[in-house]
Amino acid sequence: MGPTASGKTGLALHLAEHFPLEIVNADSVQVYRGMDIGSAKPTLQERQAIVHHLIDVTTPDDPFSAGRFRTAALEVIEDCHRRGVIPALVGGTGFYFRAVEQGIAEIPEVDAQIVAELNRRVCDEVGLACCYAQLQQVDPPWAARVEPGDRQRIVRGLSVYLASGQPLSYWQQLSCQQAPEGPALRICKLAIEWPREQLYARINQRFEQMLKEGFMEEVQGLLSRGYHGDLPAMRAVGYRALIGYLQGAYDLARAVELGQRDSRRYAKRQITWLKAEPGLQWLAPEGAKQAALDEVRAFLQFFKKK
């Protein structure tokens, strides 16, 4: 686990050199084919060296929900257990981890007319900022997890409230209080804790490196294949900043600035979530690989004795 650019993949690959381990992707963008550079997807060489699951599962126009992820991940986990292999979930998408461990919230269905009306209001009437302010009033916990420009999640929060009379965060909390269906899991949670300024510097540097590796061309290719900017996948951090540049909304310098800013904000939200994650072991960057080895060995030895 861990925020973007913290070194999750490198740590997982190191562990795989010492344990019978296969990696289960828990990044909500790496599930999409063609979204490689911007999602920091493991290289082909890395994926050939160590078995990776749930990468390139579907196309960017096919939303991959937390429910779909939970079903697929549990199948992989059970298969790994049957073969005597350790499944290691690697990624920074908190609701994917939560879906596996706690189950999925049973949220009431929302009539399509409500969603359509909210989208119309956002586009044609009051605007996104006003809708976000309304979300802050009716569902502060959900609003705190949503970017002011995230139209999809703002509409999602308001639509559930209008349809059920209860905020989305209420239904999520209700589900978390219930025992999830599925196998009981024993989990060792690890994350690398960088000083904030060092992490932000890594994020800025990585975004620039992605551009050198062809991130802009990747986005151009996705758009040329018909994957438009309103798709949830295409609004992922980094992608939407470059789409704005390609559509003439601002210059390249501004696109880089927005991409880096959005990545830093995303990391901040990830850290906030991780700080509240029970049982998580934080590792200092110096010596993180050895510390992770020690933690995993102790974890496996503890349950081996039981």
UniProtKB/Swiss-Prot annotation:
Q: Which UniProt keywords apply?
A: ATP-binding, Magnesium, Nucleotide-binding, Transferase, tRNA processing
**SS bond list:** none
Q: Which InterPro entries match?
A: Dimethylallyltransferase (IPR039657), IPT (IPR018022), P-loop_NTPase (IPR027417)
**Could you tell me which residues belong to the region Interaction with substrate tRNA?**
27-30, 152-156
Which reaction does this chain catalyze? adenosine(37) in tRNA + dimethylallyl diphosphate = N(6)-dimethylallyladenosine(37) in tRNA + diphosphate
Q: Which residues bind ATP?
A: G2, P3, T4, A5, S6, G7, K8, T9
What's one GO BP annotation on this UniProt entry?
tRNA modification
Which residues are listed under the site Interaction with substrate tRNA?
A: T93
Name the source's superkingdom: Bacteria
Ligand binding (substrate) = T4, A5, S6, G7, K8, T9
Q: Which GO terms describe its molecular function?
A: ATP binding; tRNA dimethylallyltransferase activity
Indicate yes or no for the key word ATP-binding.
yes
CC cofactor: Mg(2+)
Q: What is its EC number?
A: 2.5.1.75
Its function? Catalyzes the transfer of a dimethylallyl group onto the adenine at position 37 in tRNAs that read codons beginning with uridine, leading to the formation of N6-(dimethylallyl)adenosine (i(6)A).
Record-stated family: Belongs to the IPP transferase family.
List the NCBIfam families hit by this protein, alphabetically.
miaA
Please give the subunit comment from the record.
Monomer.
Q: What is this protein called?
A: tRNA dimethylallyltransferase
The root-end lineage is: Bacteria, Pseudomonadati, Pseudomonadota, Alphaproteobacteria, Magnetococcales
